[in-house]
Design a protein with these regions (language model features):
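GIY-YIG nuclease catalytic motif and its immediate N-terminal context
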Residues: 1-60, 81-104
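Short arginine-rich
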Residues: 63-76
Length: 104
């Protein structure tokens, strides 16, 4: 069955992927086969996985989670699904804003 998965790398970063054989793929990551990102950050640990009916859905979930913040990924890993909607909103208050002057 197809899977979307999250690995925690030795440097504390996360890697998100999808595969049809989860056990084999985690072994490959730890052997340095495939993704260069994880090859340089071994060992890796599987911290989250979700099974999907087909690989297209697993790949779509992978792409979605890759776009998430670290905090949102960690909420998913913890199973804190109630926190996900709040973490989806970008906090623009920490960025300086520039407005066009009002036309008179």
């Amino acid at each position: 069955m197809p899977w979307m998965y999250i690995l925690r790398c030795a440097d504390g970063s996360y890697y998100v992927g999808s595969t049809i054989n989860l056990e084999r793929r985690v072994v490959e990551h730890n052997e340095g086969i495939g993704a260069q990102y994880t090859a340089r950050r071994r060992p890796v640990e599987l911290v989250y996985s979700a099974e999907f009916p087909d690989i297209r859905q697993a790949y779509a979930a992978e792409k979605q989670v890759q776009g998430w913040s670290r905090a949102k990924r960690e909420a998913l890993i913890r199973g804190d699904f109630d926190a996900l909607p709040g973490l989806a909103k970008k906090d623009f208050s920490k960025y300086p804003t520039k407005r066009k002057p009002d036309k008179e």
